[in-house]
Amino acid sequence: TGEKSISCSECGKCFIKSSELTVHQMTHIGEKTYSCSECGKCFASLSHLRVHQKIHTGEKPFSCSECGKCFLNRGSLVRHHRTHTGEKPFFCSECGKRFAASSDLRVHRRTHTGEKPFSCSECEKRFLNPWSLVRHYRTHTGEKPFSCSECGKCFARSSDLTVHRRRSHTKEKPFSCSECGKCFTSSSELTVHLRTH
């Protein structure tokens, strides 16, 4: 029947198998018994450890039949495949906006609730999602982890590196104006241009 009959006493989440509930409950009590021999990071289940270990080996066994891009796990491949199909099965009940990944919907919902659960330990500024916090934190550390293979220039954000490569090296302009056909290296440049029409 597909009925989820076993629930977690801590948060109420339901499961079909008791083994799934056991693994889930470890996330509450902090019990993580499987550790990575490479970096020491710990996991609640062996399957999660095995997925993590592929980061060290570079193994990406799941490949996209459309474009050949490879992924660490099946879930990432499924999410990626939606970029080809345009499928967006997750929608916001507040505004109707649709998303390809449930995690994107979860972050989007915070724009309605105003929740910003991730805070900077340096300045207390708060963010909707963890990657925005990581990006922001680089303004304090000065870290620029993205370097150009052509000239060696470094950037704090991967998107800045992409725009730099287009401007300085490839001369690629993938964003075109539907009104006049003029092309731009970044979506932000196109947005500014569109205001002139």
From Swiss-Prot:
Gene3D superfamilies assigned: Classic Zinc Finger
Keywords, ordered alphabetically: DNA-binding, Metal-binding, Nucleus, Repeat, Transcription, Transcription regulation, Zinc, Zinc-finger
UniProt keyword annotation of Metal-binding present: yes
GO biological process, one term: regulation of transcription by RNA polymerase II
InterPro entries: Znf_C2H2_sf, Znf_C2H2_type
Pfam families the record matches: zf-C2H2 (PF00096)
Cellular localisation: Nucleus
Any one GO molecular function term: zinc ion binding
Gene Ontology CC: nucleus
Zinc finger (C2H2-type): 6-28, 34-56, 62-84, 90-112, 118-140, 146-169, 175-197
Family listed: Belongs to the krueppel C2H2-type zinc-finger protein family.
Function field: May be involved in transcriptional regulation.
Protein's name in the database: Gastrula zinc finger protein XlCGF17.1
Species name: Xenopus laevis
Phylogenetic lineage: Eukaryota, Metazoa, Chordata, Craniata, Vertebrata
